[in-house]
Amino acid sequence: MFYQQQFDVIVVGGGHAGTEAALAAARMGSKTLLLTHNVETLGQMSCNPAIGGIGKGHLVKEIDALGGSMAKAIDKGGIQFRTLNSSKGPAVRATRAQADRSLYRSAIRDIVEHQDNLTLFQQSCDDLIVENDQVTGVVTQMGLKFRAKSVVITVGTFLGGTIHIGMENYKGGRAGDPPSIALADRLRALPFRVSRLKTGTPARLDARTLDYSVMQEQLGDSPTPVFSFMGKREDHPRQIACYITHTNSKTHDIIRGGLDRSPMYTGVIEGIGPRYCPSIEDKINRFADKDSHQIFVEPEGLNSIEVYPNGISTSLPFDVQFELVRSIKGFENAHIIRPGYAIEYDFFDPRDLKQTLETKFIKGLFFAGQINGTTGYEEAGAQGLIAGANASLQCQGKDPLILRRDEAYMGVLIDDLATMGTKEPYRMFTSRAEYRLLLREDNADIRLTAKGHELGLVDEERWQAFNIKLEAIELERQRLRDTWVHPKHAAAEALNPLLKNALSKENTLEDLIRRPEMTYETLMNVTEFGPGITDPKAAEQVEIQIKYAGYIERQQDEIAKSRKNENTLIPLDFDYSQISGLSNEVVAKLSDAKPETLGLASRISGITPAAISLLLVYLKKHGLLRKTERKTA
């Protein structure tokens, strides 16, 4: 039977991608259905209890700048906050928060349940309704049919999921949850390229059985960083410590002794695992010269006895897990509450997606999260928001939201996936962004919030707060440019001891902040020049904009040059074999990828600048040259 209400957007899956997708579509006014196999696990952290990190924190800030939920939820559920790379430049500084799983999940559910235009329904999705190569709805496990104009699939590791512990394996989406077999079969029957990936998780330990006195204590930052641009420190629950210990040569011997029963090393697991979050088996094999590896002992919550030993993900048999855990300093009497395991699952080649995350073969069908080959909550959430927004925009007949590589890490993420694909779980790093000085955590709102407000993703409260901050920055920068200090100025006596070289000529306050030894805060402490602006985030923005102005201007010049032909459209049915001078390999790659623009074509692996030049000349010669008119943020 058909459900009586028709929706604009249906989102399948209630994880990090699914919740952001459903919330985005609903915020934009689309009637949205979030279909999940269990409403109790909305926003569940299936692996490590943490949000953020290098590159990942940047994505969280961008999600937040567009009105998303992840940063708000971790501010309410974070039990330890740290700024990584705090001694380095602003481009690579990143926020990371340890999470209380229960508090984080509750925060996400609260946001979902109070979102207008969003309906929750608990059922697995077993089938898609596709008519004339366009998705028109879904069919649930009990045969109930829902109609919609767009469908977003965000099913994580559930598609054909198989859990491995030693040589034993069974079907599962994650420990304790069933897999999605029928939907996996349905998607495999469509013309998408499909393969398998693998990820894993460590055993969970009973905190009461660990000896913390022999471990290194790791405290959070004080004062604590705040993740959301709308957040405040008062949102944070009680803060607690993490701990650090290490594997040793005995641990490694135990692991080597169990490799003959490892599903990874006996060929049982075919999927490729994450390069940057390898299992402990992989670590001792790939880094055989190392006699120890670091383990972060992370609490799972304020009221939980479980800890997450980050660094010893494994799918070894339980008896080997037991021995290796107890060989570690501080874990000698550890009780394992849940065994570690690996999970193998289906993913679909993201080169079969448009930059909107809509599939190229089925109109109205969008993919987001691990189904596209990524790993990590943050990568999933970022894709979910973009997919949900574009599903809504398509329903409204509006131009899509496509973020460029120079505008957002979200743009880098999706561009990498759609143009180059991936053969292993994709993780975001700052090194993936060629314009990372412009894509800092601190300016995510300046880059994206205006666009979010225009699209309906950002509410009025956030918009007003953003404009107040922006005005404060602009007024303060003008004041600093207009205030001059002469060597004989009354404040010079207090100022000179703060400078490497005393004032010898007239300077503006902006000139003084450009000096390496001077900070905005230090200058404002000089009575004649302070107190400055009270919002620390606005003050930080003032200082960064002044100190890095030259570098930022150079990157903007580079972007202007590279963007010249970036948005030149290529006809979707274009026959590349018509172009004289293109090699068969290049013709095959371009025909296979079907890039929408010259910019996308240029980033396909193996496509040379010479090939792009030939393509551009052909398009000009045959009157096919036109720029995209779609909106990009």
Curated annotation (Swiss-Prot):
<dbReference type="InterPro" id="IPR040131">
    <property type="entry name" value="MnmG_N"/>
</dbReference>
<dbReference type="InterPro" id="IPR026904">
    <property type="entry name" value="MnmG_C"/>
</dbReference>
<feature type="binding site">
    <location>
        <begin position="13"/>
        <end position="18"/>
    </location>
    <ligand>
        <name>FAD</name>
    </ligand>
</feature>
<dbReference type="InterPro" id="IPR020595">
    <property type="entry name" value="MnmG-rel_CS"/>
</dbReference>
<dbReference type="GO" id="GO:0030488">
    <property type="term" value="P:tRNA methylation"/>
</dbReference>
<keyword id="KW-0963">Cytoplasm</keyword>
<keyword id="KW-0819">tRNA processing</keyword>
<dbReference type="GO" id="GO:0050660">
    <property type="term" value="F:flavin adenine dinucleotide binding"/>
</dbReference>
<dbReference type="GO" id="GO:0002098">
    <property type="term" value="P:tRNA wobble uridine modification"/>
</dbReference>
<dbReference type="InterPro" id="IPR049312">
    <property type="entry name" value="GIDA_C_N"/>
</dbReference>
<dbReference type="InterPro" id="IPR047001">
    <property type="entry name" value="MnmG_C_subdom"/>
</dbReference>
<comment type="similarity">
    <text>Belongs to the MnmG family.</text>
</comment>
<dbReference type="InterPro" id="IPR036188">
    <property type="entry name" value="FAD/NAD-bd_sf"/>
</dbReference>
<keyword id="KW-0285">Flavoprotein</keyword>
<dbReference type="Pfam" id="PF21680">
    <property type="entry name" value="GIDA_C_1st"/>
</dbReference>
<dbReference type="InterPro" id="IPR002218">
    <property type="entry name" value="MnmG-rel"/>
</dbReference>
<dbReference type="Pfam" id="PF13932">
    <property type="entry name" value="SAM_GIDA_C"/>
</dbReference>
<dbReference type="InterPro" id="IPR004416">
    <property type="entry name" value="MnmG"/>
</dbReference>
<keyword id="KW-0274">FAD</keyword>
<keyword id="KW-0520">NAD</keyword>
<dbReference type="InterPro" id="IPR044920">
    <property type="entry name" value="MnmG_C_subdom_sf"/>
</dbReference>
<dbReference type="Pfam" id="PF01134">
    <property type="entry name" value="GIDA"/>
</dbReference>
<comment type="function">
    <text>NAD-binding protein involved in the addition of a carboxymethylaminomethyl (cmnm) group at the wobble position (U34) of certain tRNAs, forming tRNA-cmnm(5)s(2)U34.</text>
</comment>
<dbReference type="GO" id="GO:0005829">
    <property type="term" value="C:cytosol"/>
</dbReference>
<comment type="subunit">
    <text>Homodimer. Heterotetramer of two MnmE and two MnmG subunits.</text>
</comment>
<feature type="binding site">
    <location>
        <begin position="273"/>
        <end position="287"/>
    </location>
    <ligand>
        <name>NAD(+)</name>
    </ligand>
</feature>
<protein>
    <recommendedName>
        <fullName>tRNA uridine 5-carboxymethylaminomethyl modification enzyme MnmG</fullName>
    </recommendedName>
</protein>
